[in-house]
Amino acid sequence: MPNLSKSKYITFCQCPKALWLKQYKPEEIVIDPLVQARFDSGTQVGELAKRLFGDFVEATTYIQTDDTAQRLDLRAMTVLTQKAIAEGVENIAEAAFLYGGCYCAVDILHKTPQGYAIYEVKSSTDLSQLDVYAQDVAYQKYVLANCGINVTGTYLVNIDNEYVLDGEFDVKGFFNINDISQAVANEYPKVPGRVAQAKKMLEGNEPQRDLGEYCHKPYDCPFWEYCSRGIVPHPSVFDLYRMSFKKSLEHMHEGRITLEDMRNEKLSDTQQLQLECTLGNKTYINKDGIKEFLTKLSYPLYFLDFETEQTVIPKYQGTHPYQQVTFQYSLHYIEHEGGELKHTEFLGDGKTDPRRALAEQLCHDIPLNVCTTAYNKAFECTRLKELAEAYPDLAPHIINIRDHIVDLLDPFRAGYYYKPAMNGSFSIKKVLPALFPDDLQLDYHNLSGGVQNGGEAMNIYPLMASMTVEERKKTRRALLDYCCLDTLAMVKLWEKLRKVSEE
């Protein structure tokens, strides 16, 4: 039987079935790109944390499985770890231990006068998931204790969200070290029983389990699509606008799963509109509401969209962990009624801090006191506020832009225009294909270059700095095309609103 790793143990704690599927049906895993990006950032943080206590020995060892793939060589890692312990090494990174089919690699094993302390590294900035972290570390302590290691302390290393890059990067200032011994002590007695249960379950057939809160708590399960297949129809109660997952589960467990089942339930106005339009396969248009919204727009009219990067490790002076750094914008505009649609844009180089140049060009491209639209303007307004704070000399103009932004999301969120294809979402990625189902020009899936959503843009931009000239050129084009489509989409939505209000 395969070894039970700490990640598998944590999966078992959330849902035993998920562990079985991870072991025997990994092809069913579906991971959101943003979740994968968080995993990747966690790896970066782990590498950085190894420097916390000075010199260290790295136990990580790989074995080549074919020309392109590698996997961890667990046996070699445990041998290297034991050698480092015998030599009195003070810090061992990824210290590996194997006991009775249970395997773990400790992020940092730090020598103390009486034994060793476990330091578990997380890319979080708070302790909101302390119960899960304690399960993780308790499992490690269990394995180490059974390997004869005297564990003298258990600590969680996470990110200080108040850290600001000022001069040289300070690895000690970047991290917080938290003593979680009490939380680990509370979890420790549960480990042997859970380990036995997990091993027994893995020896059997696929377990049966109902959908529950654990499907998304504490983490989104990558097997949701697999487990809900054949159980949850489309559309369903899970698609109702702003209905919590917990509430949707309650309805499902009481026998209400389809929208038809929800006819006699108390719903919000928007949910009721969604239900009626979907079941009746009809479009709802409130012309008066749309006309009232359109009176808020005036020429010259600008359509603005930002893209940001959000790195866990600050890259630019004055920034903090996970700060949204605006690196790109697209701007379509029409100067007067019947005027030509024009476009301008900005994109950083991926190497230097793009914010000052972006802010300067934005102030040049958008005059004072003009009407600008954004889709879900809270995002753009927050970025503008941050730019104004970073560059006080540009602040008056930037704040003026912010104060004249009208949200193009408003008429859709208000329910003035609804089509069944929106499926309870007013995201531009849902609204656009619902209103223009046959317009290939507006289909994000037709974009080439690997950038078809904001998450992909966020992930690929930081990589530009290390790309070849040809790769950078291709990526730059892909980013420009994607962001341009966002603002073109806004123009098309505005035109559609004008058209239906006049029909």
What are these regions (language model features)?
Residues C15, I108, Q140, C221, ...:
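A residue-level signal for conserved active-site and pocket-lining positions in enzyme catalytic cores
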Residues V89-F97, Y103-D107, I118-V121, Y133-A198, ...:
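Conserved DEDDh/DEDDy metal-dependent 3′-5′ exonuclease domain
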Residues V121-Q129:
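Short beta-strand-loop-alpha-helix junction that forms the active-site gateway
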Residues M1-Q114, F245-T283:
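Metal-dependent nuclease catalytic cores that hydrolyze phosphodiester bonds in DNA/RNA
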Residues E162-H234, E254, V431-E503:
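Acidic, Mg2+-coordinating catalytic module of metal-dependent nucleases/exonucleases
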Residues P2, K8, A37-F39, V45, ...:
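Cys/His-rich finger/ribbon microdomains and the adjacent scaffold used
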Residues E28, L127-S128, Y163-V164, T258-L259, ...:
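Flexible loop/turn segments at secondary-structure boundaries
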Residues F97, G289-L368, E389:
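Conserved RNase H-like, two-metal-ion catalytic cores of nucleic-acid enzymes
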